[in-house]
């Protein structure tokens, strides 16, 4: 349902004058299931896919669990970013990650419904909140995927 709604909204935006020109739309997916990413990507519209790049932020399950526990704040537990998921739910919902099945290389393109979508995988461990660490980490990954995207647009 959510991806279908996203497709509709993007189609509406694209149909307007100026649409998504010079704009970035970020869609975040969470891992989960033997075909979680593959299934989610396969539901995106061709209009989204032909404009898309993927930045996969790689974090081990154990690190995800550690961050889940660390961000929990009893006093503000109703907050969007302060909640916690029980370990059993984390394992059941997010314990499986199919990303490396569909994108085994560090960067490249994956074919989704006949569209080659550029991607790069960025390791996000160890965790950091330091801009001096995060800046170069993200810059390297985003430069790589931007280069792949530019090459795909030249074809």
Name what the model sees in each region:
Residues 1-49:
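Glycine-rich phosphate-binding loop used to anchor ATP phosphates in small-molecule kinases
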Residues 27-30, 47-70:
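Conserved phosphate-donor/acceptor-positioning beta-strand/loop module used by diverse small-molecule
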Residues 24, 52, 119:
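Hydrophobic anchor at the start of a short beta-strand
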Residues 38-42, 53-58, 79-85:
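Short, exposed beta-strand "edge-strand" segments with a Pro/Gly-rich flavor and a Y/T-containing core
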Residues 46, 62-155:
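Conserved GTP-binding G-domain of TRAFAC-class P-loop NTPases and closely related GTPase folds
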């Amino acid at each position: 349902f959510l991806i279908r709604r996203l497709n509709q909204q993007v189609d509406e935006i694209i149909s307007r004058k100026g649409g998504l020109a010079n704009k970035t739309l970020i869609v975040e997916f969470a891992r989960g299931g033997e075909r979680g990413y593959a299934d989610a990507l396969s539901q995106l519209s061709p209009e989204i896919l032909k404009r898309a790049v993927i930045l996969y932020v790689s974090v081990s399950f154990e690190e995800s669990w550690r961050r889940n526990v660390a961000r929990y704040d009893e006093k503000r537990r109703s907050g969007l970013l302060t909640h916690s998921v029980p370990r059993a739910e984390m394992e059941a919902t997010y314990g499986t990650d199919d990303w490396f099945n569909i994108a085994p290389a560090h960067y490249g393109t994956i074919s989704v419904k006949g569209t080659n979508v550029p991607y790069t995988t960025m390791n996000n461990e160890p965790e950091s909140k330091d801009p001096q660490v995060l800046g170069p980490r993200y810059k390297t990954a985003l430069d790589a995927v931007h280069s792949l995207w530019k090459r795909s647009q030249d074809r």
